[in-house]
């Protein structure tokens, strides 16, 4: 949950702590570990969350953790066919990069921002300058590894106070060590949902 927490904190900071309530947000990779926690947290904070997923059979799961709307990757591509499109979201959490990030950037509202932390969709992306100079949008990189321990502690304190999440059992699967190989194969094939807790 650290990366998700840092992403949400960065977006809140970008909005000068005006709060995330009543915002429209988008989360890519929404069935994964970072994505699912982001959906839950944004929903808890009062944002209307659109979950973007390549797992079209997981709508019930995504609704159960707080997503108001669900878009397939194909539907996302249909919403963004121009360098700058209709304003759909105020903020976003992107774990994919690549084409998905390119598409999300075209649909941000004026003054919007995306916190990007992953590269499962590729290590590069394409964008025009328009979202940045015509709408004042921002792309915020999230580093959850090299940041100071104090910054990590600050995020964890949020989770233990004002960001306490209920229903984590929906996104956590506990497995014995001998089943770890099966879970790794599921991750590599893109079939993993939520987080896996290995019981030793």
For every predicted segment, state its role.
Residues 1-73:
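Mid-domain Rossmann-like dinucleotide-binding core that forms the NAD(H)/NADP(H) cofactor-binding site
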Residues 76-87:
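Short amphipathic alpha-helix with an adjacent loop that forms part of the alpha/beta core around
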